[in-house]
């Protein structure tokens, strides 16, 4: 029987948000694999999130009747690619390759709308039989209009819509050797013949690209990234600035990464 396995990567997140993320995952997932850890360039000295965050993850999963695997270790991750690759490695320990699906959320996201679990699984089964390897969901991102003085002033003067909506890939058929190469949204894996397949990325010339489907019912994810506190937002922006200054992420043809 097909299983949907949730994958969650986080660092120093609100326990309330984490509990909401895990509880919402249980609406479509049988098991969740959670990875805690800081990027090396992130402006903080701690290596692991607080134990209260770990308890929130475990308790929310257990209360929701969902299996849970939590991995936390006292070291940093070089970059986003290495951490996400580790998450895929952990997920593949739980998944039946080329049969089960991964559903990915971040610690600042919550699944707010979706069909009943069996309906989602049936849709994913049908997609897999049709050769589909990636299925999208709808993402809502809403900013807090009063997070800063500038936003408050803008909100008072202009009729600004603070919600952004887009389609984003979130369900991934589990492939052997799933990993992230080059840049943080370049996912690759191996099909049943051992051929490297691009699951998500920029290489439009790649001949081995996974087949995508635009939706899986009305699955809607709310992203709360812009609702964080001012200091956390500053730390995030500092990390991205340092990451880009170091040129840690590169875009090039897929075959060059594996050369």
Features from the language model and the residues they span:
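Cell-envelope/extracellular polymer assembly enzymes that use nucleotide-activated donors
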Residues: 3-5
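Catalytic-site signature of metal-activated, phosphate-bearing donor transferases
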Residues: 78-88, 109-259
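Short hydrophobic beta-strand elements that form part
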Residues: 7-9
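Short, well-formed alpha-helical segments that are part of the catalytic scaffolds
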Residues: 13-28, 34-36, 45
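Short beta-strand-to-loop acidic/aromatic patch adjacent to the donor-nucleotide binding site
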Residues: 96-112
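Active-site-proximal specificity loops/subdomain of glycosyltransferases
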Residues: 37-100
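Short, high-confidence coil segments that cap the C-terminus of an alpha-helix
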Residues: 29, 97-99, 129-132
């Amino acid at each position: 029987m097909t299983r949907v396995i949730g994958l969650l990567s986080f660092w120093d997140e609100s326990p309330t948000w984490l509990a909401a993320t895990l509880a919402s995952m249980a609406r479509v997932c049988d098991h969740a694999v959670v990875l805690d850890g800081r990027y090396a360039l992130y402006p903080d000295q701690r290596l692991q999130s607080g134990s209260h965050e770990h308890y929130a993850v475990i308790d929310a999963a257990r209360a929701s009747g969902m299996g849970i695997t939590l991995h936390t270790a006292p070291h940093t991750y070089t970059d986003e690619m290495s951490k996400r690759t580790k998450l895929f490695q952990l997920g593949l320990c739980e998944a039946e390759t080329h049969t089960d699906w991964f559903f990915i959320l971040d610690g600042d996201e919550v699944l707010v709308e979706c069909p009943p679990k069996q309906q989602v699984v049936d849709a994913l089964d049908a997609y897999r039989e049709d050769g589909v390897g990636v299925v999208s969901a709808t993402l809502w991102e809403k900013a807090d209009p009063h997070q800063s003085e500038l936003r408050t002033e803008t909100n008072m003067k202009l009729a600004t819509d603070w919600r952004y909506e887009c389609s984003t890939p979130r369900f991934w058929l589990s492939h052997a050797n799933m990993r992230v190469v080059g840049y943080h949204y370049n996912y690759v894996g191996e099909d049943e013949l051992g051929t490297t397949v691009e699951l998500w990325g920029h290489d439009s010339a790649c001949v081995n690209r996974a087949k995508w489907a635009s939706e899986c019912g009305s699955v809607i994810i709310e992203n709360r990234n812009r609702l964080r506190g001012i200091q956390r937002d500053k730390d995030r922006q500092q990390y991205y600035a340092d990451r880009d200054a170091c040129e840690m992420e590169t875009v090039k043809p897929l075959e060059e990464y594996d050369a």
